[in-house]
């Protein structure tokens, strides 16, 4: 007999919307309980027809492991097979969990017409190559993401929506905060000024962008020269030299039990980690692909156990991975996409017994970053989220 655990209020509302057609995308804030919701859906699906199967597609090995841990509490291990991260199944069991990049090894073994397809972090399937693997006649579909829409292309409509269906339920930060599903949080925006030579280059790029846009009659991102000017200006800002010292200043000023720090690249991560480890009271580690699987796992376990109180990453912790221990997040580049910012904020908003609130710090260095953040801050302020702006004292 399948046991059904008590659903949260939003899950009670969302389930019948999905069950009616057994198709659609659930847009849920990170930490809101989308995995729990999906497990409830697949349990009901299998109870309704035990002859059916489940395929769960995830973007990373970390999420593969997390899904396995959650499902193994609800199903016999013999019913679950893994594909990805060194595991390659040859027999499709009742429930199969696969990373996106390993899916090609087993997709021909799946009977789509008898399968519920669940795609976690479903914005990740929005490429032509990945989409092609999943354009089957699935019996049922369920997409999960805090950010299903994509910032820089129309592939949500062209690819993702065609495979999984419409967004049928939206549960955002404000809803989750009101329902006490996530902790209360504060936002701090810190201005790390460009150095004089960086400021001069920034102004030159901006003038060149304006001239090119005037020449072609607007900001057409298909225009390669314009695209490269914008790219090079963004790279200048992302790598501005004051970001790291200001981040170090802030991490010392605002006391937190533990921090996750998101840098722009591996070089920044290495430099930030090196400096923090010289500070009294801080033990820092890195989590990125420069480390092997065992080293990354070791640093995660140390962080969870409290032996590290700072974990520095580039993009490896962006999506899906549970880090409830952290109550501070620092985003060293405000130029990241809206989707990426939401994912990163979500890393520290999960409720734990001793967490009173979370602090999310974003460092910015340019007018373009400021304008984007000002719009975000105004939206959160209207909902009662404490917001503070300051600039570096160095």
Residue positions per predicted region:
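Conserved pre-motif I regulatory segment
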Residues: 1-27
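Post-DEXD/H (motif II) to motif III coupling segment of the RecA-like Helicase ATP-binding lobe
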Residues: 124-185
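A conserved SF2-helicase RecA2
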Residues: 173-183, 336-345, 350-394
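A short beta-strand element within the Helicase C-terminal
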Residues: 114-115, 310-314, 318-335, 340, ...
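Walker A/P-loop
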Residues: 21-42, 262
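Conserved helix-turn-beta segment of the N-terminal RecA-like "Helicase ATP-binding" lobe
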Residues: 62-86
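Conserved helicase ATPase core of P-loop NTP-dependent helicases/translocases
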Residues: 81-90, 258-262, 267-277, 281-318
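Interdomain linker/hinge connecting the two RecA-like lobes of the SF2 helicase core
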Residues: 22-25, 170-259, 264, 272-277
